[in-house]
Amino acid sequence: MTYSPGSPGYPPAQSGGTYAGATPSFAKDDDGKSKLPLYLNIAVVALGFAAYLLNFGPTFTIGADLGPGIGGRAGDAGTAVVVALLAALLAGLGLLPKAKSYVGVVAVVAVLAALLAITETINLPAGFAIGWAMWPLVACVVLQAIAAVVVVLLDAGVITAPAPRPKYDPYAQYGQYGQYGQYGQQPYYGQPGGQPGGQPGGQQHSPQGYGSQYGGYGQGGAPTGGFGAQPSPQSGPQQSAQQQGPSTPPTGFPSFSPPPNVGGGSDSGSATANYSEQAGGQQSYGQEPSSPSGPTPA
């Protein structure tokens, strides 16, 4: 049986929720500061140690014009490499947690190392040539000095570091997903479903009962509230073989009796409503009577 919407026995309809889009969060820095000074200090340390390693290569060579059999490595950059290595050590000390920062001292020492390396390259003694390791060594020392000076300017507030870009956090908490909406509405309990196949004769007969204005037995095609009529499993010739009495409403609903016969004689049979099931299906109260077979009396 079915329940009309709003009645106490009617099941609550499940409302389909909307799909809430995932809102990715962006991870911010803990202190909101740029990490550019940290990267520059790391560069100062790396460039200082690179200059120290390049000093083992041929920075200066003895020319062959000094005499036969004379040639080879003449020496190293000397003081410039020592000063650059000192700047790298001081910058590395400032990277330690809870350590005092020496950005000013590192910048001064790094600039001094760059000036010494440039001076040694320009004031080359006669009979000496610059080896291949001297040029990358000078480049490392100069870049170290530039990085140390930029760190000092950032620390003093002369220049401003760019704001850190928010990074997408793949492990961030996504927004909650709402309930998915139902595909269609569930049929009422007792509502006739679709028939898989057609009935014989190309017609589909649905049982008819009392009128829908009483909230009782309605046609099986559309739900009228109350107790829905169940479709008859038999149709066609099988229905004609069975005769059913008038549909009896359930307990608590008003019953309806056939109307009295109007007139007499042979017309009385045609005036009464036919409550038995005909070959085409059942007829309800108030349905027009079927015309009797045979010739109509004049």
Swiss-Prot record:
- Here the segments flagged for biased composition (Polar residues) are 268-291
Cite the residue spans of the region called Disordered.
Answer: 188-298
**Residues annotated as transmembrane:** 42-62, 77-97, 102-122, 134-154
Note the InterPro entries from the entry. DUF5336
Entry's localization field: Cell membrane
Task: Identify the domain of life.
Answer: Bacteria
Keyword Repressor attached: no
Protein family according to the UniProt entry: To M.tuberculosis RV0954.
Q: What name does this protein carry? A: 34 kDa antigenic protein
Species name for this entry?
Mycolicibacterium paratuberculosis (strain ATCC BAA-968 / K-10) (Mycobacterium paratuberculosis)
